Design a protein with these regions (language model features):
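Active-site-adjacent structural elements in enzyme catalytic cores
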Residues: 1-181
């Protein structure tokens, strides 16, 4: 990663822009979860229906506090790490984040660049795989640039983690595995 990339990406996010960044398994596309226009732009870019919902990543549990009612101890114990959990959202969480789902998908990321970006932006971020409509997720910055070109506002140039698959998604209340890893 080039010096200054993190701060530049964080400023773009705070202004409502879209940024690609490395995560545990693949590149993620992210933005400010509460910036409606940014989230809807991201969904259009991916060709993803709003009703599918989105994952939020954070550097720590404090960044998730404005979005969730509580984080169970067994969930906290799995973080930071490649574990995404469905938890109860606050009533104020907009539908463009949760989609048709009663719970919100959240993760405290273990990827150092993704975590540093959340810290630099001062917020949890939307995190969805860098692909279009069910395609194979981009695993390098070059793949991201080839897929999206100038449609993104910024790409952080670094490498993804060594996770062998996307993070599993599990319901924190029922324990049900919603998406295998």
């Amino acid at each position: 990663m080039h010096p200054g990339e993190l701060q530049q990406a964080a400023q773009i996010i705070r202004r409502g822009g879209l940024v690609a960044y490395p995560t545990e398994y693949c590149f993620g596309l992210g933005c400010d979860p509460l910036h409606r226009a940014a989230v809807l732009r991201l969904l259009r870019l991916k060709r993803r229906p709003v009703d599918k919902g989105l994952i939020l990543i954070a550097a720590d549990t404090e960044q998730l506090a404005r979005y969730v009612t509580e984080i169970p101890e067994h969930v906290r114990a799995s973080w930071p790490g490649p574990h995404t959990w469905l938890v109860e959202p606050r009533e104020s969480v907009p539908g463009w984040i949760t989609g048709q789902h009663p719970r919100l998908a959240v993760r405290v990321t273990a990827h150092p660049v993704a975590a540093a970006l959340c810290k630099a932006a001062g917020m949890a971020l939307v995190s969805t795989s860098a692909n279009r409509g069910g395609g194979v997720p981009a695993r390098t910055d070059r793949e991201v640039e080839r897929l999206f070109g100038r449609e993104l506002d910024f790409v952080i140039h670094d490498v993804v983690g060594d996770a062998p698959a996307p993070t599993p998604i599990r319901d924190a209340v029922t324990g049900e595995l919603v998406r295998p890893g």
